[in-house]
């Protein structure tokens, strides 16, 4: 499969690295970062490295220690503190154990730790039982291609390619079983060996130092890649094209309909965030005749079972079908494949063992692309990268001989591996306990400043993925830059003009293609009031206020509702109105009229969208400390011939609680609550954030 991940052999990139006399741990960090940045070698979060060192002890002595990549760290970004330090003499007891449960293994390793740090990696036993000083373990495309065939073929090819320098190890489950298996074949590993290929589990390379280990790894991976290239040239694996590859604009229009339907179908218990990939070479592979049959044979490494699922879903959709028919087809085909999954689950599950909610992480749609689903954008992107690497390995393995993954029973065991399922379940439980909007997608229109900017941060704090949209592109960019560091992968900015239908279309399209759908629209776009008596107001003043406060809002709500209906999981629409919507004010016909129109539109929307589970509510905020309100204060003060401070005092005195300027976060908090399950029975509502203005009380 043509793929940018494997477009060339791996280049040796050590040139700018530490010299031979550098600190050994610094050199290991550099090695790890090099591996982590090379997606042909390691996909995000995968792989592990280690070094054995003599460390000083508090009593002035020393201890032989294993420093190994800690659980939850990433080779691409790991630093010195990311390596767990363990006592090698204590770890040596593993040699004498015939079996060990995962729980016992983790407790044993915790007792071997020399200092606080990340929990030991599940591959720590393997690193500890191998005698070599520096070890690197990768899930590289080349090795996975070579070892996802029968044991007999894989072992023969490894022997032919490396003449004993690389040893083939049949599959054992990662953790203690793999370490025990390798320990048991120690007498078959010649002293000249520089590494091992692990069936379905990648490459392990040894070295005296980090530089040597890296050089050997590049050499081995490239030697395998050269062999694979000859196999690809000799055998046409995928066959002729069966499906067409539409132009980018056409397939993305289709994806706009398909993605929300997928998101709704997969998000029955917990919502998912989607990543969409329509790269040309990927679509060419999906269009091939044999691809559907090949991808149903499985993944290429247990690591990818965790990150990309057991099997991809395959959707065949009619490009000429109406939108409603496409949504129905997506739901039907996913439902059928869910039934197949449940049948597989019944074949191997214990009586009380539940089928997984996160059973499907990859969907392949010929003519459209690949969709990956996870609890957050970064994890969905990781699933994409893992499956891209796996798909290439699958095609390569078929060119070598015949692609063959693990037996179904082993796949089930790994999918339900308690050590990993516990992490997933704890993450979900923590999300539910601490976040009001986990895994949600929210658009904030007017998010560049004031209430909208505060809301963008509050929605993200609540667990949402947020699209910050504003007319001011610079403000949007600044808002995202200020928030993205706290919420990596969960914040994008889009410039939008709500007076322009094509601009609104682009905003909602970008949201769907980026995150897969939409759960909440918060509309807080606004213009400063244009004060003038009825006898002097101009038509263009009325139109300008209506365009933003009413017409733009209605257009945005309609687009949001369309996406939410495709998902079929309800949703929330919240808009910031104003006291002026219900309280007449002198010279405010343009502003008050537009806000009153917005409030009535929200009530109509609540009536129309309620049967779809879409809730629509309004917030009446007054004297909020925003640039827009402060401009309003200046204009009012000038019109009355008073100071700004005197004008603000007037506002303070008129509310029952006697509060001055209200922070925009107070409105943002209300918006988050209205969007959340806390208000799941509330629609058509009108809540105030104003300190108590009797004339603005809802009637």
Segments (PLM) and residue ranges:
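Substrate-binding pocket helix/loop in short-chain dehydrogenase/reductase
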Residues: 532-534, 538-543
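Active-site helix of classical SDR
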Residues: 557, 594, 602
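Alpha-helical segment proximal to the catalytic Tyr-Lys
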Residues: 562, 607-608
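Residue(s) in the substrate-gating loop at a strand-loop-helix junction
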Residues: 578
């Amino acid at each position: 499969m043509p793929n940018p991940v494997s477009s060339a052999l791996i280049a040796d990139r050590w040139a700018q690295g530490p010299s031979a006399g550098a600190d050994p741990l610094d050199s290991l960090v550099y090695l790890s970062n090099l591996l982590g940045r090379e997606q042909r070698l390691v996909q995000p979060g995968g792989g592990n490295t280690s070094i054995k060192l003599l460390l000083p002890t508090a009593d002035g002595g020393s201890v032989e220690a294993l420093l190994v990549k800690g659980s939850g760290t990433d080779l691409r970004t790991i630093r010195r503190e990311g390596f767990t330090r363990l006592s090698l003499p204590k770890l040596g007891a593993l040699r004498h154990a015939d079996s060990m449960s995962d729980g016992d293994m983790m407790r044993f390793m915790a007792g071997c730790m020399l200092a606080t740090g990340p929990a030991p990696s599940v591959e720590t036993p393997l690193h500890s039982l191998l005698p070599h000083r520096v070890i690197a373990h990768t899930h590289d495309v080349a090795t996975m291609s070579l070892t996802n065939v029968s044991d007999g073929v894989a072992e023969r090819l490894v022997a032919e390619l490396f003449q004993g320098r690389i040893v083939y190890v049949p599959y054992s489950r990662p953790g203690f079983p793999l370490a025990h298996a390798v320990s048991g074949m120690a007498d078959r590993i010649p002293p000249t060996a520089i590494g091992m290929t692990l069936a379905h589990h990648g490459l392990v390379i040894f070295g005296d130092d980090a530089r040597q280990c890296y050089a050997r790894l590049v050499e081995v991976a490239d030697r395998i890649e050269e062999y694979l290239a000859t196999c690809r040239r000799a055998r046409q694996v995928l066959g002729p094209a069966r499906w067409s590859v539409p132009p980018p604009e056409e397939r993305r229009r289709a994806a706009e309909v398909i993605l929300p339907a997928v998101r709704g179908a997969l998000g029955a218990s917990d919502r998912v965030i989607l990543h969409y990939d329509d790269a040309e070479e990927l679509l060419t592979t999906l269009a091939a005749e044999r691809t559907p049959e090949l991808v149903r044979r499985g993944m290429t490494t247990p690591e990818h079972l965790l990150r990309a699922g057991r099997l991809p879903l395959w959707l065949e959709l009619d490009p000429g079908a109406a939108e409603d028919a496409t949504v129905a087809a997506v739901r039907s085909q996913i439902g059928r494949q869910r039934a197949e999954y449940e049948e597989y689950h019944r074949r191997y599950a214990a009586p009380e063992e539940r089928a997984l909610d996160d059973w499907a992480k990859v969907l392949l749609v010929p003519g459209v692309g690949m969709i990956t689903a996870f609890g957050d954008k970064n994890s969905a992107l990781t699933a994409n990268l893992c499956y891209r690497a796996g798909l290439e390995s699958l095609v390569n393995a078929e060119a070598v001989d015949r692609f063959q993954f693990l037996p179904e029973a082993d796949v089930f065991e790994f999918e339900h591996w308690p050590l990993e399922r516990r992490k997933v379940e704890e993450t979900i439980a923590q999300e539910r306990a601490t976040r009001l909007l986990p895994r949600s997608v929210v658009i904030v229109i007017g998010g560049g400043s004031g209430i909208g900017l505060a809301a963008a941060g509050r929605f993200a704090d609540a667990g949402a993925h947020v699209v910050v949209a504003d007319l001011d592109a610079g403000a949007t960019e600044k808002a995202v830059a200020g928030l993205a560091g706290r919420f990596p992968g969960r914040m994008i900015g889009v410039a939008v003009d709500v007076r322009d239908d094509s601009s609104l279309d682009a905003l909602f399209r970008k949201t769907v293609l980026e995150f897969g759908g939409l759960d909440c629209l918060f509309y807080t776009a606004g213009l400063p009031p244009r004060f003038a008596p009825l006898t002097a107001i101009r038509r263009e003043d009325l139109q300008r206020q209506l365009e933003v406060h009413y017409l733009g809002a209605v257009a945005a709500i309609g687009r949001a509702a369309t996406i939410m209906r495709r998902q079929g999981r309800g949703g929330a629409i919240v808009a910031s109105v104003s006291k002026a919507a219900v309280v007449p004010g002198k010279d405010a016909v343009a502003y008050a009229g537009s806000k009153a129109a917005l409030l009535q539109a929200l009530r109509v929307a609540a009536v129309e969208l309620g049967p779809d589970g879409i809730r629509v509510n309004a917030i009446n905020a007054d004297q909020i400390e925003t640039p827009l309100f402060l401009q309003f204060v200046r204009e009012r003060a000038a019109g009355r011939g008073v100071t700004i401070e005197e004008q603000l005092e007037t506002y303070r005195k008129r509310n029952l609680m006697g509060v001055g300027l209200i922070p925009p976060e107070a409105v943002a908090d209300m918006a988050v609550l209205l969007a959340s399950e806390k208000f799941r029975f509330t629609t058509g509502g009108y809540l105030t954030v104003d300190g108590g203005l009797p004339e603005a009380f809802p009637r």
